[in-house]
Amino acid sequence: MTRPAASGVSRKLAMSTEPSSTGHTPPLDRLEKVQVVSRLLKQAPPGEFSEAFSDLRALVKDDGMMYEEAPGFCAIHTKDHFTPMEAEDFKVLLTRHNELEENRFLDPEGQVSFKYDHLKREPTDFQAHPEEDEGGELWRRELYKSLEAYVNNHYPKGTCSVFIKDTAVRRILVACIESHRHKASAFWNGLWKSEWTFALTPASTSTEVTGSITVQAHYFENGNVHLSVTRDVEETLLVTDEAQTARDFAKLVEKAENQVQNGLMEEYRKMNNTHMKSFRRQLPVTHTTLDWEKIVTGKIVEARAIL
């Protein structure tokens, strides 16, 4: 199985090999290489970080830099893609929102923290991390319960996490959803993720929810087709008690994600009738495909009549 190199990589890195007006080759310095590689690896399709890293390694021709910076590159990819981490008794998304310090993450459901090796994809050094704000934890737990029910009903393999950040005047709740399908054997990979944030103050009767929904897909059998869609959402959420607000929030997320999915399906339908039309053979004047089964059946009937 072959896979195309990362789009635009060779063009950008070719700058280091093209002669300048003075006849000399201006090489990229280390910092420039790190910046270029980091930017391109952030665009790596879901489930293809290792392949993109190998492509870039061959183009950069600086193994020392690549392997020294690999943990940092991988950490960015892990957090950007809301990578799920599953251990014996818990499952949590790895994001920038629950990174307590470099490479140490919090699982609010299990109330533990752990170190994570992004290259080996292994958690270690588990430590108890109880939530001190009991009132805030009640909001977070109810939100997680409603969101988990939504994810279980709408995703074949989905994961969600809810995090809380306390400030002097308000609580900030962040909810993340991730679902991926990696089918390299069938030449495609895909990811759906969304992130939702809103704040609560003691006198809150409503709050503004901001969300971002991202869909990525890559199909690479005899070609190289990328899909990358991001939709931003802003909605008002009524704040009552913890349980009701959590249920209303889950309904808000469901409505927004359904709109994105339906919009994508409508775009595919339009593309099928417009952009993709030129790639197909023309239909007969009836604008219907031939019913070969009906034709074959008719010939069998005719043959029997003759006999």
PLM feature spans:
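Generic hydrophobic, helix-prone segments enriched in Leu/Val/Ile
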Residues: 70-74, 84, 192-202, 246-253
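Short secondary-structure boundary motifs at beta->alpha junctions and helix caps
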Residues: 222-271
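Surface-exposed short loop/turn segments
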Residues: 137, 141, 145, 149, ...
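Extended interaction regions within the primary functional domain
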Residues: 135, 179, 232-236
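Generic signature of intrinsically disordered, low-complexity, basic-rich segments
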Residues: 1-2, 10
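Short stretches within intrinsically disordered, low-complexity N-terminal or propeptide regions
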Residues: 7-8, 213
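A structural "domain/chain start" motif
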Residues: 8, 12-160, 167-169, 262-265, ...
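Context-dependent free N-terminus signature
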Residues: 2-3, 16
